[in-house]
Amino acid sequence: MHTAPSCNPELLQSSSPGVHIVMEGREVFKYAVKAMEEAVLALLEQEQVSIDAISLVIPHQANVRILNKLVERLGIGAEKVVINVHKYGNTSAASIPIALDEANRASRIQAGDIILLCSFGGGFTWGAALIRW
């Protein structure tokens, strides 16, 4: 594709293969969950921190289904996870800072807490970080 359909109205009507961007949602979902889970587990092993030592998890707020599946696979209680995607939608790179600020303002974070941040985003990039508050 050489141009976005919105720039060329004829492309909006086209059913030709290769003209429109297509996302394989199920595959992206599976890959996102797997990539974040692996990043989190590798980080915890590297830093010698157990999952039980985590006080709060603040994941990228892309999709509540991805968040729920990640939490399930990691065995983290829902009470330890900040989810606000239902309030703001996917705010892209701002989702973790917004959720961190909300958790702090709600006194969900105390001095000395270990906070897990994890993300998966456009371009198939992902990562995880630990913060001691």
Give residue spans per PLM region.
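Active-site-adjacent helical/loop segments in soluble small-molecule enzymes
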Residues: 84-96
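Hydrophobic alpha-helical segments
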Residues: 73, 77, 88, 102-106
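Buried hydrophobic packing segments
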Residues: 40, 96-103
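Short active-site-adjacent structural elements
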Residues: 65-68, 93, 124-126
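Hydrophobic pocket-lining "lid/loop/helix" segments that shape and contact the acyl-thioester
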Residues: 1-85
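Conserved beta-strand-centric core segments of catalytic alpha/beta enzyme folds
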Residues: 100-133
